[in-house]
Structures are given as C-alpha cells and as structure tokens.
C-alpha cells in the first residue's frame, strides 16, 4: 500500500481527497485541527501549525508517493479593513508554507521515480481580485512559483510536475463560512486525483463552462473585468 500526505486535509476539498485516496492508499493528514468526523482505518492525523518556524515534521514523511497541499484561507473585505497581522498570516499559510513544504520534498520531485504533487491555488491568482486582494496576491505568487519550478523540473529531466489546481468558489467547504458536504466535493476530489496521477501541471475546474470566458475578458480589459468582479462579490452576500 502506497502512502499519501494531505496538508490541510481536515476539511473541505482536502478531506474529500484524503477519503478518496484511503480506498487504496495509506493517508496521513497534517493540519492544525483534526477532522470533525471519524476517519477510516487507513487515515491518520498529525497536528501541525503552518505558522511554525520548524518544518522538520515533513522530513518524517519522505516515504510518501503523493503530496497534496490544500491548506489556505482568505477574507473577503475591503483592504482598508484588513489587519496587518492578517496579511502576514495569509502569506505564511497560503504561500510560504507551500513553498517550504515543496522544498522539503524537492529531492523526490527531482528524482526519476514517480512523485505526485499538487497544490490548491485559486482562480484568484490569475487575475485581479478586488475585495480579495491579499488572498489573490498570495495565490498569484504561488501560481508563478509552481510554473517556474515546473520548468526547472522539465529542464532537469525529471518526469514529475507540480499540479496547480485553481478553482473558483467550491461548494461544500467551510472556506466561505459554510460546512463540509462531501456530496458536493467528492466529484471534484476524484477529478483532482485524476490530474495528479497523469502529472498534469494545471487544472482549472469548470474551465470550459465558466473560466475560459472570464480569463478572456480579463485579458481583453483587466480594468473592466476587475470592476465586474468587485460588483459580483458585493452582490454575493459573502461580505461581512
């Protein structure tokens, strides 16, 4: 039985991925708090705060064959209402943590053996995201990091790549204050695992249905699309 490591797997899409993988892999979830549900036999949990200065915990998991990083958070708000501590914590958890974890597993990525690695980014990293400016900035940095590292991996002759998973809003998670609903996240989890296993480097859920047009509008006139995004968020009812 192969081993998989899910960072941020206690809820949302991370939990759904962990549960799907547990059907045929031994899975370890690393997160700040444990899942609120009882876990199958093949899933273990280790507590870790991604704001910790010591990431040595990941050196004890070098035997995994799959790494999926899903940890992250955001706050929908005007920038004037965002605290400086929120800015620091956002980059630490959303960006720096993922980069540090990849560094701990980089020898595995460079090696000749299959190592499946993916990171939850966001469509917000592909365009301006007013009222979500800090979150979008953390994800934009992560997007460029992944693209850059994938070029380095290719040029080194490695068969491995990092999968950038960049969805819009995902139903069935507690990201926007809702609750976990596996009925709404399981299908997406299966799709992500499929892209991981085929070593794709980018997966944008609902690309053809929604985001191809959105990205094209942004490319054509990023100012107008930014205003549209601002108005859409205000009308969404998610502003606190």
What is each PLM-predicted segment?
Residues 70-75:
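Conserved NAD(P)H cofactor-binding loop of Rossmann-fold oxidoreductase domains
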Residues 160, 164, 177-217:
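C-terminal helical subdomain
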Residues 122:
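Residue(s) in the substrate-gating loop at a strand-loop-helix junction
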Residues 102, 138:
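Active-site helix of classical SDR
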Residues 78-79, 86-88:
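Substrate-binding pocket helix/loop in short-chain dehydrogenase/reductase
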Residues 10, 15-18:
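N-terminal Rossmann NAD(P)H-binding glycine-rich loop of SDR-like oxidoreductase domains
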Residues 127-134:
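Active-site loop immediately N-terminal to the catalytic Tyr-X3-Lys motif
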């Amino acid at each position: 039985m192969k081993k998989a490591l899910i960072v941020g797997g206690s809820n949302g899409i991370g939990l759904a991925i962990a549960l799907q993988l547990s059907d045929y892999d031994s899975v370890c979830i690393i997160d700040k708090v444990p899942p609120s549900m009882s876990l199958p036999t093949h899933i273990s949990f280790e507590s870790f705060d991604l704001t910790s200065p010591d990431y040595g915990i990941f050196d004890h998991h070098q035997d995994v064959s799959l790494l999926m990083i899903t940890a992250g958070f955001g706050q929908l708000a005007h920038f004037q209402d965002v605290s400086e501590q929120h800015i620091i914590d956002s980059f630490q958890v959303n960006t720096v943590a993922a980069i540090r974890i990849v560094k701990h597993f980089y020898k595995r990525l460079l090696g000749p053996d299959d190592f499946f690695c993916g990171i939850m980014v966001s469509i917000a990293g592909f365009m301006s995201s007013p009222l979500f400016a800090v979150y979008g900035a953390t994800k934009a940095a992560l997007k460029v990091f992944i693209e850059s590292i994938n070029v380095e991996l290719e040029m080194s002759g490695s068969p491995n790549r990092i999968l950038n998973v960049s969805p819009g809003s995902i139903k069935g998670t507690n990201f926007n204050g809702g609750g976990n609903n596996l009925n709404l996240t399981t299908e997406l989890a299966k799709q992500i695992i499929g892209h991981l296993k085929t070593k794709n480097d980018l997966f944008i859920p609902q690309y053809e249905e929604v985001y191809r047009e959105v990205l094209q509008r942004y490319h054509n006139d990023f100012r107008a699309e930014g205003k549209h995004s601002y108005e859409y968020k205000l009308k969404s009812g998610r502003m606190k």
